[in-house]
A protein has these predicted regions:
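Short hydrophobic alpha-helical membrane-embedded segments
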Residues: 20-28, 79-89, 106-111, 182-183, ...
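Short, amphipathic, aromatic/basic-enriched membrane-interface segments that mark the entry/exit
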Residues: 14-20, 70-82, 100-101, 189-197, ...
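A generic, well-ordered mixed alpha/beta core segment in the N-terminal half of proteins
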Residues: 85-156
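Long hydrophobic alpha-helical segments that form multi-pass transmembrane helix bundles
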Residues: 125-205
Length: 223
């Protein structure tokens, strides 16, 4: 009997980590650009620019934190940044905060997300918590009152949870709720304020389907 030995992986997949993260990053940026366009048309250029500024703050903070970590660990900074995919965490975190969040709150949240929730656990693929979710938790606990005064309106999720306890009692109540946000069309198209990346639901669903078809994500997880 003849045995053949070869190094792992024994099962190969054409989907590389680099490709998966690049396509995911592109998808997230599509959502971000759509949000910027909405805020520019509905709330003016200052709101749109603030969205871009929040993303820039998160990205710069991410690269600074990961560069310092790479230096401390005596790793090549450029190689580490390319393989750490920290920008994905920065984009997701930015999409999870409201447009009226202050920049310094996003910077602090990014430090917690990158350093405490990711790098200290070993970096990409080793963290036990979602870094962006940790950053959002920091904002919710420590910076809920910090904003720049662009938007103060309640989002649909907060209204339906606090007012209707997630279940409108009848059709009239449901119509009253929907009218605040332009009906089902308004909810689908995201024509209301909220977290930067949460409102354009129809676009998010379309991107999710595309990513599932391309096998970038497993459709069973979001479903």
């Amino acid at each position: 009997m003849k045995f053949t030995f070869h190094v792992s992986p024994s099962i190969k997949n054409n989907l590389s980590t680099q490709r998966i993260m690049k396509e995911l990053s592109l998808s997230l940026l599509v959502v971000f650009v759509a949000a910027v366009i909405y805020y520019a048309s509905a709330w003016g250029a200052s709101a749109a620019l603030h969205c871009v500024l929040l993303l820039a703050c998160s990205l710069i903070t991410t690269f600074v934190c990961e560069s310092i970590f790479a230096k401390i660990m005596k790793k090549d900074v450029k190689t580490f940044l390319k393989s750490s995919f920290g920008w994905v965490t920065a984009i997701i975190l930015t999409l999870m905060v409201p447009v009226n969040m202050s920049c310094y709150a996003v910077i602090i949240a990014t430090v917690f997300a990158i350093v405490l929730a990711k790098l200290l656990f070993g970096g990409f693929g080793q963290n036990i918590f979602n870094p962006a979710a940790v950053g959002r938790a920091v904002i919710l606990q420590a910076f809920t009152g910090v904003s720049v005064g662009l938007i103060t309106q309640a989002t649909p999720t907060t209204v339906i949870a606090s007012t209707y306890h997630w279940l409108p009692s009848n059709a009239a109540v449901l119509d009253s709720f929907l009218s605040q946000y332009g009906g089902f069309a308004g909810l689908a198209l995201g024509t209301y304020p909220g977290s930067i990346g949460e409102t354009f639901s129809i676009l998010i669903l379309i991107i999710g389907v595309v990513l599932a078809i391309r096998q970038i994500i497993d459709w069973r997880v979001p479903v």
